[in-house]
Every structure is written in structure tokens, then in C-alpha cells.
Amino acid sequence: MTWKIVTDSGCDLRSLTRQSKELRFERVPLTLQIGTEIFRDDDGLDIDNMMTTMYQSSKATTSSCPSPEAFLQAYRGADNVIVMTITGTLSGSHNSARLAKNELLEENPNVNIHLIDSLSAGGEMDLLVLELERLINLGLSFEEVVKQITAYQQKTRLIFVLAKVDNLVKNGRLSKLVGKVIGLLNIRMVGKASNKGTLELLQKARGQKKAVSALIEEIQKEGYVGGKVYIAHAQNPKICEQISEKIKSLYPDAVIQTGRTSGLCSFYAEDGGLLMGYEI
């Protein structure tokens, strides 16, 4: 039996830990438009160039979800397909993936396919994909993998830290005045993905050190006691080190992985920000 894990670019991972003929990973890119320029969030995207273009532009950046056909092409060629998308509250990607699922089943009624709305993005999606890989490599049945990943999703969370809010201002979600104050006072916005997949602000912290303390406080409130962590960061390895050191000082056995945000997640996190997934 062959497997595919299919995600959109709300997931930061470019590949699995160990790919094989039996298990393949497909990442279906969203696109980002800045003025007249279009950036496809695939492996060839120069994220630094995209971010520079974004900050130089006075216009709002918009994202477009993959077409159902793009998902359908990614689904083909496996007996078992598990699909995961960025939260449906931020993108139409989940709906495109659902339409493609229906088309695939019309083409091939014998294929096993399961679609998951991550209700999240970035680090939490990354954790979920890594767990999917682990479960599949255990040799479990399709039904058992679906059962276990559904249970696992109830035990993962997303927390984010924003160091810049240019996109929120350009998209009209924050006033220019508030945006300037945040920049001048070196304020970090700390928030989370709710259980409905919306992004909620939790705290405002002045400076990175206080933002790390706020993050630790919030994940402990959610029930964190040393589970796995995946930190997806936008050009900020320093905050990854600070968070890792703090978590390790409290929970020495915690397994912490870090990586750079995808183009889409860089757009949401902005320079210096992060989207961290963790287990409770």
C-alpha cells in the first residue's frame, strides 16, 4: 500500500524526515500577490526577496488558495491519502481540497482519502505532519492512522509572536497609529489559534525577552508540561534559542525542533515573528 501526505503551504516543511516509495509528501502552494507581482509559495520561492518586496510596497498583500485541480494532481498516485490544510478561517484552501477529494473519489472510488482542517498554520501543522509520518511508518492501517491523528490534533496548540504588524495595518486590521506605536515601543504581540481556527491576541509584551516570558506563561496555561515543540520562525533564530533554553530549563526532556517559515507563514508572522506548535 502506498501513502501520500498532502498539505498546502500553510505547512513549513519541505520534505519528510524519511521519504520512500511507499510514503511521499506533496505540498500544494498558495500564491501571494504584492502589487502586480505574484509569488508562488513553492520550493523555488526566494522568501527574503518576497518579504523585501512586501515591505517596500504600500499596497496590501493578498493570498490566493490552490485550485481544486492543483490538489487533485497532488492526490493521484497513492492508495492512501491524508490531506491537511491551513485553517479554513484564513483561506479557501480547505474548500479547494474538499472539492478535489470529491473529484478523486469519482475517478477512483477505491482510494482511501481523509481531509483535515488543521484549524491552524505553521508550527502546529508541522507537528501534525511529523506525527502523521511517524504513524504511517509504524505500519498502521488507514483507519487507525486517521483515528490516531484525530486524537493527536486535540493535544496540539499554536502560539504566535509578532514583532512587526505592517500587514495588519495595510490590510486594515490595525490602525496606522497603533502600528506606529507598536514599532516605536518595541512591542511584541503574543497570540494563539483558537479551537475554531481564528487568531486571538493574548498579550502585548515590550521587547523580545518579555515576549518569551509571555509565551511560556501562555503555553503553561494551556497545559504544556514538556511535550514536543516545533518553532517556525521568520528570520529570528535568536528567539528560537531563547524559547528553547527556557523550555529546557523547565522541562529538560522536551524535544524542540526549529525551522524557517514558508512564504505564506512569513507573510503572517512577518520579520522576527514565529508560529510555534506544541503538545499538551
UniProtKB/Swiss-Prot annotation:
Source organism: Streptococcus pyogenes serotype M3 (strain ATCC BAA-595 / MGAS315)
Residues given in the record as hexadecanoate binding sites: 63, 91
Designated name of the protein: DegV domain-containing protein SpyM3_1478
Molecular function terms from GO: lipid binding
Keyword check for Kinase: no
Entries under PANTHER family matching the protein: DEGV DOMAIN-CONTAINING PROTEIN DR_1986-RELATED, FATTY ACID-BINDING PROTEIN TM_1468
InterPro entries given in the database record: DegV, DegV_C, DegV_domain_contain
Keyword ATP-binding: no
Pfam families membership: DegV
Annotated keywords: Lipid-binding
Protein task: May bind long-chain fatty acids, such as palmitate, and may play a role in lipid transport or fatty acid metabolism.
Domain DegV as annotated: residue spans: 3-280
